[in-house]
Amino acid sequence: MKTSQLFYKTSKNANKSAAVLSNELLEKAGYLFKVSKGVYTYTPLLWRVVSKMMNIIREELNAIGGQELLLPLLHNAELWQHTGRWEAFTSEGLLYTLKDREGKSHCLAPTHEEVICSFVAQWLSSKRQLPLHLYQIATKFRDEIRPRFGLIRSRELLMEDSYTFSDSPEQMNEQYEKLRSAYSKIFDRLGLAYVIVTADGGKIGKGKSEEFQVLCSLGEDTICVSGSYGANIEAAVSIPPQHAYDREFLPVEEVATPGITTIEALANFFSIPLHKILKTLVVKLSYSNEEKFIAIGMRGDRQVNLVKVASKLNADDIALASDEEIERVLGTEKGFIGPLNCPIDFFADETTSPMTNFVCAGNAKDKHYVNVNWDRDLLPPQYGDFLLAEEGDTCPENPGHPYRIYQGIEVAHIFNLGTRYTDSFEVNFQDEHGQTQQCWMGTYGIGVGRTLAACVEQLADDRGIVWPKALAPFSITIAFNGGDTVSQELAETIYHELQSQGYEPLLDDRDERLGFKLKDSDLIGIPYKLILGKSYQSSGIFEIESRSGEKYTVSPEAFPTWCQNHLA
């Protein structure tokens, strides 16, 4: 391709509204054009990168028996009502919904579990057809409340999604491991630093679930890593530092605490460490047909993990109760909530079980109790793991070793769904005895746009984008000074020779200074630059520079061999 033919535009100035580096550079380098909030045009330059990534995905998925198809973007509401997700998604405003001329409700696809199940249910008949792996690379729509960070959180997104159907839990697990391995190979080929972490399945499903997280300081997700094990902080199980508590129970006392509403102020008032305080939070659980308030007791020095609470209690959504809701439900103010005389169900994190002679509130303003003990003063609560992991906590999967905390960008997510969706759509098969059996399902997805943004975030430098070799839109830039007709003729010859050998050169034939062209090449992220400047004119030797700064001097005779070693 010649720059005179390529429809692109670079900019000297960054977009001031771009919140993250990847968004800034992708727009500045001519890869991305913003149409509206969370909606972007993928320019010809970016589509070259996308096409290469899609080819890598196809190669790895086809190698394990995947079959590509294309599912519709427009879904009728009845499909989603089969699984109850229409109500769940519409209540949160995540769906783009519309009605056709007959008044029937539809949505633009945020995911495709319902559609794929309705299809497979009609065509699947025999166990001999299993395991089955179908996948697509297509657009998804999600009405994000706060679309931001360019391709990292957009309203219209490009994804690969795979679906597997199996005859048993064992075969489902085998398919899960195959997809896990294939996804690993995809990200290995991209040369990204990533970790696979245990995750919460969220609204997709509650079975085994893992995320592929690209390590990046900008990452939206917090991940806990210990050795080879990792977990999203939403799902991380951890063992916090232990504390010694009194063995002898002391007499309980009521103490006036006017205006003391924070844990820190309470610790100062009683001159005790935070871990001797039982703090209580009120949360609102949302279900399809009701809302429920519960209280959660936590050790004073630790934070609650709301995702774990929602998962434990099978809630569709969860939030901390507002001050007004606390006063309405408990008749007291925030800061004075506790297990004593609590009118709502009381749960507590497992780390509160060893606590003795602790301080807690009693659901009355300006009043706390000291030397409170389970069993003697309170009925034991309903315990659960509601702890938010912190750096330094011990990892139970790697005994004796602490977690390190990193930020990451989730680029892929894999799930075992069991029979949650196949039951709803009666995705069944006949076994060898003619008996009807249920299918076991898995779902898997790679965020194509997110992965490209993660590449930029992780690899970019102060000169611009640094694409992995496997994704770069062109393999080498051929650059010369505008107006230098001798160098231009040579550049044309080299360009056509490289094209004939299957390489992807970009001939910068603009009437611009050589330095300007080299800066553009670095901004765009092309791996190599062939520079036809003064050095070549004086020596007849090609000067080549890699995007990382390595320099090569290559004779015209040795140039084909150099290309085989570096561009192939």
Swiss-Prot record:
Oligomeric form and interacting partners: Homodimer.
Species, as recorded: Chlamydia pneumoniae
Gene of this entry: proS
Record's keyword annotation contains Ligase: yes
Main location: cytoplasm
Reaction catalysis annotation: tRNA(Pro) + L-proline + ATP = L-prolyl-tRNA(Pro) + AMP + diphosphate
Keyword Translocase: no
Entry's EC annotation: 6.1.1.15
UniProt-recorded name of the protein: Proline--tRNA ligase
Record-level GO BP terms: prolyl-tRNA aminoacylation
A cellular component term, taken from the record's GO annotations: cytosol
Domain of life: Bacteria
Domain notes: Consists of three domains: the N-terminal catalytic domain, the editing domain and the C-terminal anticodon-binding domain.
